């Protein structure tokens, strides 16, 4: 779909104005609204609240489509926009509707089977297709603006553009640029007027910034179409413009964590988690709604190096588990509004019931998806679970690798690389995945592979595979010989997520956790013999990893032999359907194990 920037920006300007006007109309709770302004010794003051969500990932209801029951975790969190809507309604009633804004920091349309269904099964892009459930819910909640997340691009630009059309609020991305013109491909900002009791409006600018890693993670969807420069440089460009346009308050909605780190190393010159750097380097920002990192930060202050101003950051927990509140207090001074004080906190969505309006609005869509994921596609001879997958070779991960290797072998049949052995990588995306004995449903398989990754075949050498395995082994915490091994504390060294620990099928190897990172992988063998450095292999690998996700060595620069446009999840579902019966005895094997001084840990 062509990127008609002018048409979109005209639409966004109209939409943004409509949002701002709606926020200015007197609503129920007008008495509370009037109380938000006041005078003390002749000084005019005004207070307002900006509410924020992030990383909703397709969660409307407090429901887990993979387990087919209400969501629950060890902390008894709840999820979904229906819960958040109840919190939003309470804040609007308390503060006064016209004294609030509601924004989001991205990753909205990917992550659940609900969002998948309306991207792929009953797609919103079809002629006369449905309105995306996330658009319906967010429109009903009167969102004022939302930044783009990296996962917005997972289904391709046409799906994103259709979602954008269906939203009654602007999608913001000041650093999502048209690759040819280098002009914004989305609205960079939105401007909102809040009417005060004094007749002097407060102008609030929301600047949206997305993640530079999109260029790596969704290379197939964006290469040659869009480019994604760093957050710091784009904020430095736009914040002065917003101030010159009369913005009294500038809020950044950033789909970027605050740690200053990048999972992709030096593959890009831009920082992945740059929200803290933006606050530190760019003057004129009052608050930053942080996203992407899936961490909870109720309130965090960063000092701007140029002005000494304290900038408040807040990140609400993912999936609608928390709602951020930025509470602003302004004072009228020297002919304009000045921020006198701003603080942040989060509200827990498990303290309220779901908003019945949202439940009624989307109950039909929910039931369609529940019926879809419960379709039986085959049988399984023995239960498989991922509970021990981070530290043991288990059949459920072997299943992923078996299907991937089988798919690549078939794809390369008759080609010059058909005779090469095929290795495959897989990671544990969920420690709660389970494929039961007996009937297997779509949700059983989908729960094992929760990301929209596609499959590629790359050409790798033995030496490169050794380096790949060594990098993956950084995932484990060094544990001295004789020390007690606690599986709960053994993994995720230096914050490495489970999805960045790959196991490789087709090779046998050991990981010595007593050794320091970088020298752990030993006894690497292929077909019983020591792995030769010059041996050549076809490597079945997901597109996230193949494009540099996780910064694994060699794979991103390796030769591409084949790629598939369909998700690995769908490939797995189709494989189970075609086979009809799954038996772990046919593919399960202990290819790798953890050791200390040659002695197995488990």
Predicted regions: what is each one?
Residues 2-19, 23, 29-351, 396-403, ...:
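Acidic, metal/ion-coordinating pockets
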Residues 41-49, 59, 72, 79, ...:
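Feature captures C-terminal
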Residues 201-203, 385, 508, 530:
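Short, solvent-exposed loop/turn motifs
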Residues 281-282, 383, 407, 411:
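Alpha-helical structural context
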Residues 342-346, 365-366, 380:
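Extended, charge- and Ser/Thr-rich helical segments
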Residues 350-357, 373, 379-380:
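Acidic, Ser/Thr/Pro-rich beta/coil linker or hinge segments at domain junctions
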Residues 363-374:
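Acidic, glycine-rich low-complexity/disordered segments
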Residues 375-393:
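Glycine-rich phosphate/diphosphate-binding loops and the adjacent beta-loop-alpha structural elements
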């Amino acid at each position: 779909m062509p990127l008609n920037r002018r048409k979109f920006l005209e639409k966004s300007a109209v939409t943004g104005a409509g949002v701002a006007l709606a926020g200015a109309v007197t609503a129920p709770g007008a008495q509370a609204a009037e109380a938000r302004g006041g005078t003390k010794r002749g000084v005019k003051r005004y207070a307002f609240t900006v509410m924020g969500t992030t990383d909703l990932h397709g969660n409307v209801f407090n429901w887990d489509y993979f387990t087919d029951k209400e969501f629950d975790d060890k902390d008894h969190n709840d999820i979904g926009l229906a819960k958040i809507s109840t919190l939003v309604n309470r804040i609007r009633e308390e503060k006064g509707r016209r004294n609030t804004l509601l924004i989001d920091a991205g990753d909205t349309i990917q992550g659940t089977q609900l969002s998948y269904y309306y991207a792929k099964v009953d797609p919103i892009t079809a002629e006369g297709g449905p309105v995306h459930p996330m658009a319906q819910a967010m429109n009903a909640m009167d969102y004022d603006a939302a930044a783009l997340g990296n996962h917005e691009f997972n289904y391709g630009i046409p799906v994103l553009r259709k979602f954008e059309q269906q939203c009654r609020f602007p999608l913001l991305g000041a650093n999502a640029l048209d690759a040819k013109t280098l002009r914004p491909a989305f609205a960079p900002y939105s401007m909102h007027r809040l009417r005060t009791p004094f007749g002097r409006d407060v102008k609030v600018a929301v600047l949206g910034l997305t993640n530079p890693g999109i260029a790596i993670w969704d290379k197939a969807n964006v290469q040659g179409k869009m480019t994604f420069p760093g957050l710091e440089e784009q904020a430095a460009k736009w914040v002065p413009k917003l101030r010159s346009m009369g913005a009294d308050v500038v809020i950044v909605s950033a789909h970027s964590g605050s740690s200053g780190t990048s999972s992709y190393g030096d593959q890009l010159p831009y920082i992945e988690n740059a929200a803290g750097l933006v606050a530190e380097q760019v003057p004129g920002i009052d608050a930053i709604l942080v996203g992407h990192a899936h961490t909870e930060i109720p309130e965090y202050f960063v000092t701007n190096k140029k002005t000494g101003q304290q900038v408040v950051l807040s990140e609400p927990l993912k999936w609608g588990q928390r709602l951020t509140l930025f509470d602003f207090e302004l004072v009228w001074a020297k002919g304009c509004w000045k921020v006198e004080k701003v603080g942040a906190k989060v509200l827990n969505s498990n303290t309220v019931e779901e908003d019945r309006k949202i439940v009624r609005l989307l109950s039909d869509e929910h039931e369609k998806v529940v019926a879809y994921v419960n379709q039986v596609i085959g049988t399984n001879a023995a239960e498989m679970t991922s509970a021990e997958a981070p530290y043991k070779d288990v059949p459920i991960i072997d299943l992923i690798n078996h299907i991937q290797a089988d798919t690549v072998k078939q794809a390369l049949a008759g080609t010059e690389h058909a005779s090469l052995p095929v290795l495959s990588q897989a990671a544990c995306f969920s420690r709660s995945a389970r494929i039961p004995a007996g009937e297997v449903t779509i949700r059983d398989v989908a729960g094992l592979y929760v990301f929209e990754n596609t499959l590629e075949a790359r050409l790798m050498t033995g030496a490169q595979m050794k380096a790949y395995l060594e990098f993956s082994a950084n995932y484990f915490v060094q544990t001295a010989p004789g020390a007690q091994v606690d599986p709960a504390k053994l993994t995720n060294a230096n914050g490495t997520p489970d999805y960045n620990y790959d196991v490789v099928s087709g090779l046998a190897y050991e990981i010595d956790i007593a050794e320091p990172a970088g020298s752990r992988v030993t006894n690497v063998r292929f077909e019983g013999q020591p792995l030769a450095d010059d041996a050549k292999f076809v490597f079945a690998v997901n597109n996230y990893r193949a494009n540099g996700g996780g910064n694994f060595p060699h794979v991103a620069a390796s030769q591409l032999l084949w790629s598939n446009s369909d998700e690995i999840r769908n490939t797995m579902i189709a494989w189970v359907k075609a086979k009809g019966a799954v038996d772990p005895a046919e593919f399960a094997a202990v290819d790798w194990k953890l050791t200390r001084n040659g002695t197995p840990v488990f």
